[in-house]
Amino acid sequence: ITPQTRALFIEPISNPQMIEIDVEPYYILSKKHQLLTIIDNTFLTPYLSTPLEEGADIVLHSATKYIGGRNDVLAGVVTVKDERLAEQLGQFHNMIGATLSPLDSYLLQRGLKTLHLRIDRSQENAQRLAERCRHSESIDEVLYSGRTGMLSLRLNKAFSVAKFLENLDI
């Protein structure tokens, strides 16, 4: 942290390592240095984590991933803790013209209705997949936090990524 630092940007679950961190010490550090805390909550979603209630000032979501849920909308969501931030970001938002169409807004609203079901199912599937991959000779390491539907794999050097993907049955 330097005198020029204005904010801490935190991914509670890193990508692609899938390492989950305890964000509480960062909230304390931010308050101590009067910094904004910005959380990228894309992997956890509002269903699994509510950073504004935990101490964050700004929370970001890639709505394209879980919130939309059907790969038919490209969007992001920014939520803020207080009116001052909302007004500042709202002015910026208007200046750059970053608004969703009515259809994209509808698609995100539709996605929110089933978010809890999709998150629960993706967690179950990811846990089962992670367990199976841990026993595969072609995989050296499974990178999985245990809390989301996302995981990463490190293939054994003797195995080709292209061949692995070609033989993957979904």
Predicted regions and their residues:
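Conserved PLP-enzyme active-site core in the AAT-like
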Residues: 1-138, 143
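Conserved C-terminal alpha-helix-loop-beta "cap" of PLP-dependent enzymes
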Residues: 147-170
